[in-house]
């Protein structure tokens, strides 16, 4: 908020400076730019297109202008829309620090801001201004400055009753104004002229910040400033309830393609919207973009690094090619319809070389690919019913839409996600605890952890999902992670062990579910080379790639140093090469060996109850 009256020391201006708005130079000629706005729009931001405009937030001190403006700025930047906020307090500390709060100075304050905002808008940015700007004429002048330059101007009245603004008065300025300690305070002894015909009114006494931001975004979408697809709404592929009976009847009459369990897991991924904006299994154009660029490029740069494809044999192609639709059948049940199918060659070796960086047939997922059909099928997917596995864990399989709602219900102002396919040890917990601490230090009040184990296919020697979920529950029970600020859910994707390529998929899927931050540690989505036993991928590359990956714009990557067991401190700690002798690296192989033999790990490596779950799992294998 702007601080008026005696709280702002007014600097005495020279005569020339005092009258500068009245002087007119005769030797100044406007210079036209060589770069057009359309050309500038091609290189500003990640989506292309000129979006320059000004969103002018006006309202009483304490109405919520700064809160809305900063949240709107964050939203737009995270969705690839370049923007910048000019805040009243900030500007009065620099450009306008020589202005006070007289009517004349308020007028000059607004004029300067309008001119600067016009330049920002002309550069292709969405310029958000957050000023009391109490006078109608001054705001009209700001509009005229923009209209004279053929730039859109949107006046947004941030409307909160005076008594609400006084209740929010964390700096006590209204109290001082009521006591006469501040003179000329807007709303108390200086008039605020409400906008007569603003483009938008935000009732901040009854709407939360997110609702206000969405209202402004919708306005900008209506005026073709922000593309509709920039909001990354989750695209679920379930048939709507009112069309379900007809679709099921249709499915029974269509030819069918049998699919396996991994295919069904990908059906679930698509149906729930994890692969937004895909309409179904990738068509050839999408497949090639994914394979060669790790992105979808139609409608902006959208990170999608792993092919989500359906395979078919030559016999299936001969039978189904030419059909306008066919059903997908899993375990004798028709679960989905694929419409307008497109068949194209499944070049397996090329796919594996690009996706995994190897064609080693002993790699578990590559082995599956090499055994699949020689054709790929893309098409629009309609899933008939929600996917349930009836394994006692379906309550953890929350969709992106459900997760977003849960975070909202928890009043989360930051969501940080942790992907894992292994049991949680205290090194993992250290990363999550430190992230929570960092977010609090950055000013977030309610950061929430999404502990999100992968729930699709994994290789044979990985701990099964059921046991991992029991182990995660024990970690929470022992208080290693805070149950009050942690959401445990299952991510339905199969595991591909594709290293830096796959970790981008893991990250962007959590982005769709509402995560703002993504924790990445050592060798994400990696595994030992099936033949040499060495790391298939350089362990630090996954984190490095994520920090550079295009299209992951709505969340921030949180890379961490390697955690190892500190023998002196008897706990997991960040590895320090200068004290190498103090550290011990406990590999997954050794951890499994200890658990299998019923031995205890070093003190502080894992929560005791969580370790007990692991030993019980390996004992169950011996009995089997």
Swiss-Prot record:
Its EC number is 2.7.7.4, 2.7.1.25. The keyword Kinase applies. It catalyses: sulfate + ATP + H(+) = adenosine 5'-phosphosulfate + diphosphate; adenosine 5'-phosphosulfate + ATP = 3'-phosphoadenylyl sulfate + ADP + H(+). Expressed in testis, pancreas, kidney, thymus, prostate, ovary, small intestine, colon, leukocytes and liver. Also expressed in high endothelial venules (HEV) cells and in cartilage. ATP 2 binds at residues 419-422, 521-525, 563. PANTHER family: BIFUNCTIONAL 3'-PHOSPHOADENOSINE 5'-PHOSPHOSULFATE SYNTHASE, BIFUNCTIONAL 3'-PHOSPHOADENOSINE 5'-PHOSPHOSULFATE SYNTHASE 1. This is Bifunctional 3'-phosphoadenosine 5'-phosphosulfate synthase 1. It comes from Homo sapiens (Human). The gene is PAPSS1.
């Amino acid at each position: 908020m702007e601080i008026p009256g005696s709280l702002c020391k007014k600097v005495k201006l020279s005569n020339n400076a005092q009258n500068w708005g009245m002087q007119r130079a005769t030797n100044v000629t406007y210079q036209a730019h060589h770069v057009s706005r359309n050309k500038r729009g091609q290189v500003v931001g990640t989506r292309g297109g000129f979006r320059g405009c000004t969103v002018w937030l006006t309202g009483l001190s304490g109405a919520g202008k700064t809160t809305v403006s900063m949240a709107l700025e964050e939203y737009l930047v995270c969705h690839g829309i370049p923007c910048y906020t000019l805040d009243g307090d900030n500007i009065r500390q620099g450009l306008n620090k020589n202005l006070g709060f007289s009517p004349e100075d308020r007028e000059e304050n607004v004029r300067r801001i309008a001119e600067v905002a016009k330049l920002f808008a002309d550069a292709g940015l969405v310029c958000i201004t957050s000023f009391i700007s109490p006078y109608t004429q001054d705001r009209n002048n700001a509009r005229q400055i923009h209209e004279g330059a053929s730039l859109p101007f949107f006046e947004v009245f941030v409307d909160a009753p005076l008594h609400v603004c006084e209740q929010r008065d964390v700096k006590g300025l209204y109290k001082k104004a009521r006591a006469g300690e501040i003179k000329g305070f807007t709303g108390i002894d200086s008039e605020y002229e409400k906008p007569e015909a603003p483009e938008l009114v935000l009732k901040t006494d009854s709407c939360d910040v997110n609702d206000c931001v969405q209202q402004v975004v919708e306005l900008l979408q209506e005026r073709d400033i922000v593309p509709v697809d920039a909001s990354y709404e989750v695209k679920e592929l379930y048939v709507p309830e009112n069309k379900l009976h007809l679709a099921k009847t249709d499915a029974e009459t269509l030819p069918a393609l049998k699919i396996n369990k991994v295919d069904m897991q990908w059906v679930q991924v698509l149906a729930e919207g994890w692969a937004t904006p895909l309409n179904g299994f990738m068509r050839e154009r999408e497949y090639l973009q994914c394979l060669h660029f790790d992105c979808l490029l139609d409608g902006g740069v959208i990170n999608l690094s792993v092919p989500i494809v359906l395979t078919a044999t030559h016999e299936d192609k001969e039978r189904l090619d030419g059909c306008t639709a066919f059903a997908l059948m899993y375990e004798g049940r028709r679960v989905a319809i694929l419409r307008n199918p497109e068949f194209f060659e499944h070049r397996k070796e090329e796919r594996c070389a690009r996706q995994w960086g190897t064609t080693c047939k002993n790699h578990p997922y590559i082995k599956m690919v090499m055994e699949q059909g020689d054709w790929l099928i893309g098409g629009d997917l309609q899933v008939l019913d929600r996917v349930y596995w009836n394994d006692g864990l379906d309550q953890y399989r929350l969709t992106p839409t459900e997760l977003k709602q849960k975070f909202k219900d928890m009043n989360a102002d930051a969501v940080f996600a942790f992907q894992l396919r292994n049991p949680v040890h205290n090194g993992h917990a250290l990363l999550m605890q430190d992230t929570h601490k960092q977010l609090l230090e950055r000013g977030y009040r309610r950061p929430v952890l999404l502990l999100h184990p992968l729930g699709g296919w994994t290789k044979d020697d990985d701990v099964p999902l059921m046991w991992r979920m029991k182990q995660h529950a024990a970690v929470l029970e022992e208080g290693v992670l805070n149950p009050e600020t942690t959401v445990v859910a299952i991510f339905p994707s199969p595991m591909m062990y594709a290293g830096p390529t796959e970790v981008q998929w893991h990250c962007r899927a959590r982005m769709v579910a509402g995560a703002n931050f993504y924790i990445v540690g050592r060798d994400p989505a990696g595994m030992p080379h099936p033949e040499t036993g060495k790391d298939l991928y350089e362990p630090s590359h996954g984190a490095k790639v994520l920090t550079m990956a295009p299209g992951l714009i709505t969340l921030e990557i949180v890379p961490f140093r390697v955690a190892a067991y500190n023998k002196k401190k008897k706990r997991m700690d960040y590895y320090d090469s200068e004290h190498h002798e103090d550290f011990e690296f406990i590999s997954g192989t050794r951890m499994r060996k200890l658990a299998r033999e019923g031995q205890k790990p070093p003190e502080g490596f894992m929560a005791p109850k969580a370790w007990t779950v692991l030993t019980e799992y390996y004992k169950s294998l011996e009995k089997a």
